Amino acid sequence: MKTLWMVLCALARLWPGALAGCAEAGRCCPGRDPACFARGWRLDRVYGTCFCDQACRLTGDCCFDYDRACPARPCFVGEWSPWSGCAGQCQPTTRVRRRSVRQEPLNGGAPCPPLEERAGCLEYSSSQSQDCGHSFVPAFITSSVFNKKRIIQAVSPQWSTHTKDAGYCMEFKTESLTPHCALVNSPLTRWMQYLREGYTVCVDCQPPAMNSVSLRCSGDGLDSDGNQTLRWQAIGNPRCQGTWKKVRRVEQCSCPDVHRFIFI
């Protein structure tokens, strides 16, 4: 078969236009396009009508020079934009970041990755710079990683210098949770998969989630006797929620990182 192919190629040199293909026709088309064809040798070594569209790989009727004339080019995207502010004030909502396409995929190249990401957030200052957002029940929690990105004075200017380091940790024993916590798989919500029934978790109460007057976090359960069932909800996935009971208050959280969260 290889010898026959070499003979055909040699004969083609004596037959003008026999090796016409995508390059000579100047064609490279997306998807399936019956009008995107040329006359020449196909990759399956049949001479006749051959195609220069993206679907020819599946149908096996590409022109012999398709790979060279129409190389696959993957999608290229730019860098992520900075995170936006919260979409609303004084209530659980979302923030967003986006990136743009620098080059669309061509000729079956790798598709574009997600161009938008959302994450939960809660602002504690209204448009009139009034302290707010502390009256929510149940307790709203998120990953402790988010705590590193909170800027105290920008969110709540009422905090004085000597109270910036105020805070405490609440330990809870998880009683129940919805199955939706284990179904999320984005980088920003993966922490929810570590919530488990019967586990003890730690939740930090830090500014700005801490009320600047009461020095408490909403939903901290500090006043419960330990037998009261309290409710919590994960920021970023409202269907991830459940119940827990207070274990104790401590000054510093000592749980493993995957079982350490913050009030928000």
UniProtKB/Swiss-Prot annotation:
Residues of the signal peptide: 1-20
Disulfide-bonded cysteines: C28-C36, C28-C52, C36-C70, C50-C52, C50-C63, C56-C62, C63-C70
Residue ranges constituting the TSP type-1 domain according to the UniProt record: 74-125
GO CC term, one of those recorded: extracellular region
Glycosylation sites per record: N227
Positions of the SMB domain: 24-75
Subcellular location field: Secreted, Extracellular space, Extracellular matrix
One Pfam family matching this protein: SBSPON_C
Keywords, sorted A to Z: Disulfide bond, Extracellular matrix, Glycoprotein, Secreted, Signal
Domain of life: Eukaryota
Matches recorded under InterPro entries: SBSPO (IPR039942), SBSPON_C (IPR056801), Somatomedin_B-like_dom_sf (IPR036024), Somatomedin_B_dom (IPR001212), TSP1_rpt (IPR000884), TSP1_rpt_sf (IPR036383), TSP1_spondin_dom (IPR044004)
The family this protein is said to belong to: Belongs to the thrombospondin family.
Protein name: Somatomedin-B and thrombospondin type-1 domain-containing protein
Record gene name: Sbspon
